[in-house]
Amino acid sequence: MALETFVNSEPFTFGVELEIQVVNTHNYDLTKAASDLMRLIQGETFPGNITPEITESMIELSTGICHSHEQAVSELHAIRDVLVKAADQLNVGLCGGGTHAFQQWSDRQIYDAPRFQYISELYGYLAKQFTVFGQHVHIGCPDPDSALFLLHSMSRFIPHFIALSASSPFVQNVDTGFHSARLNSVFAFPLSGRAPFVLTWDSFEEYFTKMVNTGVVNSMKDFYWDIRPKPGYGTIEVRVMDTPLSVDRAAAIACYIQTLARYLLTDRPLKLSEDDYLVYTFNRFEACRFGLEGTCVNPQTGERRTIAEDILDTLDRIAPHAAALGSRAALDEIGALAKARVNDASWLRTVFKQEKSLNETVRQQCLRWRE
């Protein structure tokens, strides 16, 4: 199969995708209701899209093409409200969070769609264990070479996105010690990790053709990279975030990525080298394990600082681009999180400490989702 033609898109436009948990309102475990939700929303009018995901306990919402923070917030609220109304009719709950706190993966049912059934047959129990919930952000790129430049430039900031969105401290009734345990489920897939270090679309097409010829992949969907090109949309897709507990947090993180993209592609402050990836896995682990308190190492200078400090320094550098995009309010929210060194994982742990019940913790997640 040939690689799709890269469709040039308007630079720095963006789209947000959120995978949402569907829970019962008895004990707040995951429940099988995605098909029923999809039936109920037929005929409803809303921006963007709502689609099923790999198991019946997940559903995905996505915005249209957004230009501003204000638009993203408006669209996410509108889609969220349609889903909440349908969920109320079914007496089920919806919530964010990168993992469900106490679900048993073996109870999951694969959604009846050809691709999901194919994944289940190929990956076995990993498909059911993949009942984890992420935020993806697409960024528009003017041409394919710019997309690859942005992909590799953005890779240095992966720890920021993980730490800011982290909302998966609990797995199967256990506090994992991680801020984002969700990404540990992604690591199990053979085509996860980072994209190959190629900087021209011709070279990328050559790589893709070789992979297809091995029989390992059929399309870009088979790559579970942290950031991957989406040629049919003319975007790069940042895929490392947990689904936040509120749509407002999701919009703020998306606009941080948008603003960073404008800075990286307009100012071109970085000279890219494959050696940038020497500390990639270490920095990524630190963000997953310790959140904003984690350490990140500058691959060129060797300087070590906390992820929170690196975010605050980055916010100063990209401030002029925030002004141009109208994303100052979003970046103020990001700055407040970095200064306080708190994220949704911190909030979940605080609730559990107070309530001594993961069932009650998930119930409060559902309340947060409606705010």
Swiss-Prot record:
It catalyses: L-cysteine + L-glutamate + ATP = gamma-L-glutamyl-L-cysteine + ADP + phosphate + H(+). It is an enzyme of class 6 (ligase). InterPro entries: GCL_type2/YbdK_subfam (IPR050141), GCS2 (IPR006336), Gln_synth/guanido_kin_cat_dom (IPR014746), YbdK (IPR011793). Gene3D superfamilies: 3.30.590.20. The keyword Ligase applies. It holds the Pfam family GCS2. One of its GO terms (molecular function) is ATP binding. GO terms for biological process: modified amino acid biosynthetic process. Its EC number is 6.3.2.2. Keywords: ATP-binding, Ligase, Nucleotide-binding. Belongs to the glutamate--cysteine ligase type 2 family. YbdK subfamily. ATP-dependent carboxylate-amine ligase which exhibits weak glutamate--cysteine ligase activity. NCBIfam families: gshA_cyan_rel (TIGR02050), PRK13516.1 (NF010040). This is Putative glutamate--cysteine ligase 2. It comes from Burkholderia ambifaria (strain MC40-6).
